[in-house]
């Protein structure tokens, strides 16, 4: 299982992976979780996909997308502040240049690759490691997100607990919560599954191009 980063300049080249990503989001958020999301041509999209985010994808066998997340700098419009301000204790996000927002995180847990540490799916831990590694490589040390109580528990089990930015709020058919997470070496080492391949360096330790 490998991590692929797709920055705006790579959208066209990685279009087939992005189509898979949108289909995976439709399956997880629309069909499985029954969230109120917009699905068109089999894929889930929203207005934040129009803001040139970077996507983190977990791929299996070099072809199948089994995990994804969207990253946006909070200095611009973000899902947390514009769509879910009720999750923030102050109603607004005190953004810094060292902060990145992650949203639309999901994994295909039907993949028969077994469970990794703490009985979490390998795709989940691979995605966590990829998000933290990309964040550190691009100068971010804090990740903010809006999620639900179920996923908050998953983060804690992974050894990457979230600090809440407000109280949980019932939204639709779920209970949502906002929080921030550290993007540092200690967190990366806790979540990193065996066999993880760095997205920052090649096999000889040479740095690869930034995904930002």
UniProtKB/Swiss-Prot annotation:
Catalytic activity: a fatty acyl-[ACP] + S-adenosyl-L-methionine = an N-acyl-L-homoserine lactone + S-methyl-5'-thioadenosine + holo-[ACP] + H(+)
Keywords: Autoinducer synthesis, Conjugation, Plasmid, Quorum sensing, S-adenosyl-L-methionine, Transferase
Pfam family, one: Autoind_synth
Enzyme class, spelled out: transferase
UniProt-listed InterPro entries: Acyl_CoA_acyltransferase, Autoind_synth_CS, Autoind_synthase
EC number: 2.3.1.184
Molecular functions (GO terms): N-acyl homoserine lactone synthase activity
GO BP terms in the entry: quorum sensing; signal transduction
Keyword ATP-binding attributed: no
Family: Belongs to the autoinducer synthase family.
Purpose: Required for the synthesis of OHHL (N-(3-oxohexanoyl)-L-homoserine lactone), an autoinducer molecule which binds to TraR and thus acts in the control of conjugal transfer.
Protein name, UniProt field: Acyl-homoserine-lactone synthase
Organism: Rhizobium radiobacter
